[in-house]
């Protein structure tokens, strides 16, 4: 059955699509408030009931462990975002809907953790993540809905992502049904929407059944929303989906603020009147411990750089142009030609129409702040011919160009220029410095610098001399003149341009007439008024003019008397790097060139400011490191040396997790790194994984193990001689004379170690590692399993346990029965910190890539994390 979305709606459905939600579905604020109060007040009675049940547990150790977990849950509830998050932190609320076959859970999991999980979550989930839009951080609330959209869901969301599987017809039909249901509760024009088709389940046994035309037809029926095809297995377009939907929400909010009028008291994040019991997000295990790429840096690899103030002001006019256009608009853009001859009102009208079309282009990616068709002089051929290029300027400091609009949309054959290492020049004049406001006399920015950021990563062609990837560019600073100051000395004009042809020579050597102060006065006017300075005839110049006429496709009269030809051939600007590389571009009008030049200058300024802010972040990082070291000092027992009780110790033993005085640290160094890894608390660097170990342990915990059986011995004091301290330290750590005894058990030490990891018992783990041999600490979970304690700690994303196990000799290269290393478990658990530790110590990564294919999963569909949940019962 071929499903035709949008066809055959009932009158009621048509009314819902056109006029918004019926009145009877209006959500009562009073009822929502009462429901939220009831939900909130019901939490603590249930927690107190759990405490009463805990008291009935006879095993005191188990009782204390459960109590600690409940206390942690209670603290997390009491300190939820509604009570602690600053009012200045804006939120973006995104709902994900689709049936169980859509692949939406895998899409969300890939975005949050960078890994692929095949199972679909029937109950959905609630997740949080930081996302950056236009240089500002937002708290992204992701609500994976387990069923169709309900009234409370519709009132909560800022945007909706509809998900279906390209190999499942039912999931495709479900999308439109869910859309109609959403429209019955909420006006569709108020909610940005994105349609996603997932490729995860496509295989030889499950071929694709939804072709591209049907999917795009559905996206048109869904209020012309953007359509993406994603693959959670390899991460295709996953990041782009969430970045795009966030940009749509931000753009819609700014558009609504502009519609209200200028008001400085507007809140950063609009509040919704509906609050319900289901709006408290739950914590996901893979979300809590991810600290990598990146932490969350990898997930935010498309984070935009800090935009300049001038860009924000200039982009206000077309802030609504944030959604990716439909294929109809793309086709109409291809038929336009902005280089045709125009006169009078027709010129202005057609120019604005062409610019509107250009600014609305963007297939499946964020809209650049400026884009359009320019002529670019080739740097490869001998004749230096001019060719049309589709040029885009993004707020990440990159200027990109493609042979055609089609290549740009397909993201192929593109080259990029890093503006941080360049400057922009106009042959024949010295440019003013970029300023936030529009220069007087220039035309309005009809191109409307859009707020949206481009996440596109363009692959530069190899061997092109103008490709930014072909050389390391060191830029020249932008010109520092703040305004056009009239005629300048001739020498300054000579230095402000790149002389490479007869035409450029004429522009570079021409002096401006007195009184000409406006920067929009192009070199063409100077040339036409100064015939004495024309250069000698050059065959290269004639060929250049001929090629330009040919490339524009518009016949023009030849001869020096044609002012139109001279004007159209002189709107050139050059991007120059300090290494001597040049990129020559030409616009169709002087106004368009001014827009491009000022936009490029603004991006150069923003890139330079971004470098300065990076230094500020480094300084701030040093302050944070000092605070972290201070946190280590405040750990229980760390006020005194672990061996001699000297006050205020400032040296540390990493694998012991303890602090010591400088004299004892010298003795520890002689023990060897296999017994004590010494580091200065103030002079050395402290990466996060080492700080985690030090703050988790401390002198009190360490001495409860290493001095757990002192008997009649007494430890030396701060004033004891060095020989006495050394005898004590060697007896304590080398001979292990005072080591606390192991608890009586028939279970082998290696199996106890596995249990300690699963039960998250740090003191028992340290004791077992101190007693165990290398063979015992490397004992596996079972003969047919092959997992070591390091596999389990990596699967639990436990950074402290992972680091301690490696220090005490657990083999990082060990593999389980399926050939997976601990690194594979860490990556599947979404822990970048554990993965970094394992890689640093030589854990192999083959067979455990970031995007495992579905056939690497077990036959029963489980993964290591799921097996881990059964580990306590198996142990």
From Swiss-Prot:
Region (Disordered): 1-23, 428-568, 853-875
Compositionally biased residues, Basic residues: 541-551
Subcellular location, record wording: Cytoplasm
Biased composition (Low complexity): 10-23
Keyword Repeat: yes
Binding site for GTP: 98-105, 142-146, 198-201
Limits of the GLD domain: 87-261
Main location per the UniProt record: cytoplasm
ANK repeat ranges, renumbered to this chain: 748-777, 785-814, 818-847
Activation and inhibition: GTPase activity is stimulated by oxidative stress.
GO cellular-component term (any): cell periphery
Cited SUPFAM superfamilies: Ankyrin repeat (SSF48403), ArfGap/RecO-like zinc finger (SSF57863), P-loop containing nucleoside triphosphate hydrolases (SSF52540), PH domain-like (SSF50729)
GO annotation (BP), single: cellular response to reactive oxygen species
Key words of the record: ANK repeat, Cytoplasm, GTP-binding, GTPase activation, Metal-binding, Nucleotide-binding, Phosphoprotein, Repeat, Zinc, Zinc-finger
Molecular functions (GO terms): GTP binding; GTPase activator activity; GTPase activity; polyubiquitin modification-dependent protein binding; zinc ion binding
Zinc finger (C4-type): 641-664
UniProt-annotated stretches for the region Small GTPase-like: 84-375
Phosphothreonine PTM positions: 324, 326
Quaternary state and interactors: Interacts with PML. Interacts with expanded polyglutamine proteins.
Family of the protein in this entry: Belongs to the centaurin gamma-like family.
UniProt-recorded name of the protein: Arf-GAP with GTPase, ANK repeat and PH domain-containing protein 3
Originating organism: Homo sapiens
